[in-house]
């Protein structure tokens, strides 16, 4: 069982024992909480050690398989994939997009505060492929539903055809892509992780990436960036070469007689 699942279940068990203690049915709660260290004291571990695993992002080979699997999807779903990546969008942010949120002339999406996790509006960009899919999907959407404004993504199910698409439908779509691509760890959040990592590869600063992601805390942004060991080593050598050149330039002044 995943560590996160165990932690969630412990919360329920701990709450139950707290109820028993409050009602006088038990003297103490056996499911202890972890505590951060304060005043020089060592932190106290909870009943089960909290293990935070690095989120997964695909390498280039797996990413190619994912894109190949996406090729079999509908126009709507292909647009959702490209926007999820381009804008580093969370699941709820993606499914709650309105047509009016788009500024095609500048390839911008205006994310409304009420649709974001942080409750703060922000702007993200989209690329040429997303732009072309967006125009094609609007054309298809108008033919199918006879409308342009309102929620962008509409259900094509016989049960609720034309209704705004729900988050669970998008999750099921990604699960299907994952099966066909042989990428079991692919999730709706993977596109966000990959995009933010690619921005780091493009030498965006951590502050710029945090703004794009809609993070209040830079520590949160750091958890989203997954540069490989080779990439980090290459950056180190580039930086070291620059520093060494500067040092040599300064040392060269010693060659001059004074």
Could you describe each region identified by the protein language model?
Residues 25-65, 155-163:
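Flexible interdomain linker/hinge and immediately adjacent N-terminus
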Residues 238-258:
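C-terminal secondary-structure termini that scaffold catalytic or DNA-interacting sites
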Residues 1-48, 142:
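N-terminal core-binding DNA-recognition domain of tyrosine recombinases/integrases
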Residues 36, 92, 96-139:
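Conserved tyrosine-mediated DNA breakage-rejoining catalytic core shared by Y-recombinases
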Residues 58-91:
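Basic, Lys/Arg- and aromatic-enriched nucleic-acid-binding interface segment
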Residues 171-211:
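Short, basic (Lys/Arg/His-rich) helix/loop patches that form interaction surfaces
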Residues 127-183:
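Active-site/catalytic core of tyrosine-dependent DNA strand-transfer enzymes
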Residues 115, 213-238:
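Catalytic-site neighborhood detector that most strongly recognizes the C-terminal catalytic loop/helix
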């Amino acid at each position: 069982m995943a560590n996160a699942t165990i932690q969630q279940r412990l919360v329920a068990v701990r709450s139950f024992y707290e109820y028993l203690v409050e009602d006088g049915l038990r003297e103490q709660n056996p499911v202890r909480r972890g505590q951060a260290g304060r005043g020089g004291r060592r932190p106290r571990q909870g009943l089960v050690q909290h293990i935070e695993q690095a989120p997964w992002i695909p390498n280039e080979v797996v990413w190619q398989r994912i894109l190949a699997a996406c090729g079999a999807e509908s126009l709507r779903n292909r647009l959702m994939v490209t926007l999820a990546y381009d804008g580093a969008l969370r699941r709820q942010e993606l499914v709650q997009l309105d047509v009016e949120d788009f500024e095609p002339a500048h390839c911008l999406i205006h994310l409304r505060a009420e649709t974001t996790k942080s409750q703060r509006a922000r702007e993200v960009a989209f690329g040429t492929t997303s732009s072309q899919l967006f125009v094609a999907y609007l054309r298809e959407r108008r033919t199918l539903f006879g409308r342009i404004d309102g929620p962008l993504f509409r259900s094509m199910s016989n049960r609720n055809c034309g209704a705004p698409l729900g988050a669970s439908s998008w999750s099921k779509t990604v699960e299907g892509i994952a099966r066909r691509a042989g990428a079991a760890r692919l999730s709706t959040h993977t596109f966000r992780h990959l995009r933010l990592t690619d921005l780091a590869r493009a030498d965006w600063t951590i502050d710029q990436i945090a703004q794009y992601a809609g993070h209040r805390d830079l520590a949160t942004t750091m958890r989203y960036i997954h540069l490989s060991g080779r990439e980090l080593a290459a950056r180190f050598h580039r930086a070291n070469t620059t520093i060494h050149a500067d040092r040599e330039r300064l040392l060269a002044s010693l060659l001059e007689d004074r």
